[in-house]
Amino acid sequence: MAKKNGAQSVEVIPGRKIVLSAGVGKTNIEELKWHTETVLSIAKMWKTSGWDYIADCSQMSPVSPAEGGELVTMTKKFVEAGCKAFAFAEGSSVLLKVQAQKNTQRSQTGVVEGHFATVEEALDWLKSEVHI
């Protein structure tokens, strides 16, 4: 069952070491901090074996520069906590894809990332390419 706070929701893909988050509309820094801590609390049991993260951004509004900075911090924390790959479901939004790519680059973590139209495509990629 998904945990929710404002525009953010977080859940685990059953039977997989994958955390899925989804955003709808406009978010803010407080919601993003909640999101980060919620994902970290779920994923802590997989730190040594590794886990993957899917961000469903397809229904989100673009983020502000300050919120983008919070997402960079989130990326660093997730990688430190054992996250092996980030998959982004961005629908048809080029702007969301560019923002996600820039935030990952700014994190300087070198984490594997993929960009897709749907969550299903992201899951298929994680199964076939990342093997978590």
For each of these PLM feature ranges, what is it?
Residues 1-132:
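Amphipathic, Lys/Arg-enriched alpha-helical "gate/interface" segment within cytosolic domains
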